Amino acid sequence: DIDKHMLQILKDEVDNYKAAYNLVDFTDMIEKFNVSELCPKYDVVFIDEAQDLSPIQWKMYDILKKNSKHVILAGDDDQAIYGWAGADVQRFQDEPAKNIILPQSYRVPQAVQQIADQILNRIPDNRRIKKQWASRPEGGSVDHITSIEDVPLHEGDWLILARTNDKLIKLKSILKEMAIYFEIKGRKSYKTRLYTAVK
């Protein structure tokens, strides 16, 4: 576990490094914008994936909103995935605006929608915006797999997502046992030439 004191030390080190090499990161750019509040006038500002905005991004939005004729926020509170990084989905839900819910999805097939609805309907009404929408016309399919060994990983390319690095480490050892080539954060499980030769 890292406590606040250690985080502050790490932050100070990163800040010193950036200052020494005259570097600016994405957060620095937003903070500079927010402090200066120097903002051009816009006719329209369109912000996508607004459910995943962090508090400093919402402050930036407030400044843009004051300086724009029209602001469009596009997002879906059911797809909020950056709470761990400080995203404020409640702010998205509470934003006073005219809500337009798109009635049709061209991405989600019916089988996936049915399972998603089973999960989403368990969320209390005060925690999400209720919405009705139609799935893609094709039925699609959902496979219920209880073990990674049951996934045909030798066929085609796969992307495996895990909630934590700890889970990835466990998957890594399983994939090695199965002699499956993989990359995690750019690191190859074994040399590409060896993989090609074995394949």
List each language-model region with its residue ranges:
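Conserved helicase C-terminal RecA-like lobe
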Residues: 198-199
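Short, flexible, glycine/charge-rich loop motifs used to bind or transfer phosphoryl groups or to couple energy/partner
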Residues: 19, 31-40, 61-63, 89-92, ...
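Conserved helicase motor core of SF1/SF2 NTP-dependent helicases
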Residues: 44, 51-138, 155, 159-177, ...
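Conserved interdomain hinge at the start of the Helicase C-terminal
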Residues: 141-156
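An alpha-helix initiation/capping motif
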Residues: 24-27, 110, 144
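Accessory N-terminal region flanking or inserted into the helicase ATPase core
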Residues: 1-46, 55-60, 73, 83
